[in-house]
From Swiss-Prot:
It catalyses: N(tele)-phospho-L-histidyl/L-threonyl-[pyruvate, phosphate dikinase] + ADP = N(tele)-phospho-L-histidyl/O-phospho-L-threonyl-[pyruvate, phosphate dikinase] + AMP + H(+); N(tele)-phospho-L-histidyl/O-phospho-L-threonyl-[pyruvate, phosphate dikinase] + phosphate + H(+) = N(tele)-phospho-L-histidyl/L-threonyl-[pyruvate, phosphate dikinase] + diphosphate. InterPro entries: Kinase-pyrophosphorylase (IPR005177), PPDK_reg (IPR026565). Its EC number is 2.7.11.32, 2.7.4.27. The keyword Nucleotide-binding applies. It comes from Sinorhizobium medicae (strain WSM419). NCBIfam families: PRK05339.1. Keywords: Kinase, Nucleotide-binding, Serine/threonine-protein kinase, Transferase. GO terms for molecular function: ADP binding; ATP binding; phosphotransferase activity, phosphate group as acceptor; protein serine/threonine kinase activity. ADP binds at residues 153-160. Disulfide bonds: none annotated. This is Putative pyruvate, phosphate dikinase regulatory protein. The keyword Nucleotide-binding applies. Coiled coil: none annotated. It comes from the Bacteria.
Length: 273
């Protein structure tokens, strides 16, 4: 079949941490190197209100929907809304669960996150996920000292997906956008506990990703310079200077996967391992 797109939106909806979906989605996407998956991860979706907000996001950026939702009513709602929107969706675990049921001759428990043992480590991961979702993109800037890691960087340097990946390892992570001319929160500059790391990428790569981002929106929503390489180069220059002034380590994510970026962050502070 002819390759239709060089990028696509991949929506991953889970009633647990989302690790299963992330692994499955990336394994599948890796088979199509000419198409780049723009991941949207929605963990801990367990009621209708949460799910309807997710489906609004899917409607705004149509693409492939993968989900692991054991509640049959919610799963049915995903199927229904995806049909209405006109996007494909797959319940990743259902075929596997049905195979187990057939072979073992007994029904499954249909319990969210049943693969996780309810121990201290598990609850730490859930706490980290909640913290990270609450502190995405500069939200709640007053309590940075509760974070283990704070990621700073210009737009589209994978701050959010990297934060969620770290949270899945029990690492409380906040992220802050770097915008030239806009001061960083005062609480970040006085924080003593978190490891603060700057994320950068090449201007060429950021321009490509941002061009994909603005598709379906108006350029004026982001600003005329949002995808301009020269303007992006100035943003990166400012970000490098800011990190250098504050002695924050920098990681170039241009050719790194989310997993590789997270590993590089953890390597900077052994206590996070």
């Amino acid at each position: 079949m002819e390759n239709r797109k060089n990028y696509f939106h991949l929506h991953l909806i889970s009633d647990s941490t989302g690790e299963t979906l992330i692994a499955a989605g990336r394994a599948a996407a890796a088979q199509f190197q000419s198409s780049h998956a723009l991941e949207h991860v929605y963990p801990l979706i367990r009621n209708r209100k949460q799910l309807m907000q997710v489906m609004e996001a899917v409607d705004g950026a149509p693409g492939i929907v993968l989900y692991t939702i054991v509640d049959r009513e919610l799963a049915g709602l995903i199927d229904q809304r995806c049909r209405e929107i006109g996007v494909p969706c797959v319940s990743v675990l259902d075929p596997i669960i049905e195979l187990f049921q057939s072979y073992l001759g007994s029904p499954s428990r249909r319990r969210s996150g049943a693969q996780h043992v309810m121990d201290a480590e598990y609850f730490a991961r859930i706490e980290a996920l909640n913290f990270t979702m609450d502190h995405d993109d500069g939200q709640i800037p007053a309590d940075f000292d509760e974070a283990d890691v704070v990621l700073v960087g210009v737009s589209r340097t994978s701050k959010t997906p990297t934060s969620i990946y770290l949270a899945n390892r029990g690492i409380k992570t906040a992220n802050i956008p770097i915008v030239p001319g806009v001061s960083l929160p005062e609480g970040l500059l006085t924080a003593t506990k978190p490891l603060i790391v700057g994320l950068i990428a090449s201007a060429e790569r950021l321009s490509q990703v941002r061009q994909h981002r603005v598709l379906g929106t108006t350029q004026s929503f982001h600003g005329e310079d949002y995808t301009d390489r020269a303007a992006i180069a100035e943003e990166l220059k400012y970000a490098r200077s800011l990190c250098a002034r504050n002695n924050w380590p920098l990681i170039d994510v241009t050719r790194r996967s989310i997993e590789e970026t997270a590993a590089a962050i953890v390597a900077l502070r052994p206590r996070l391992r």
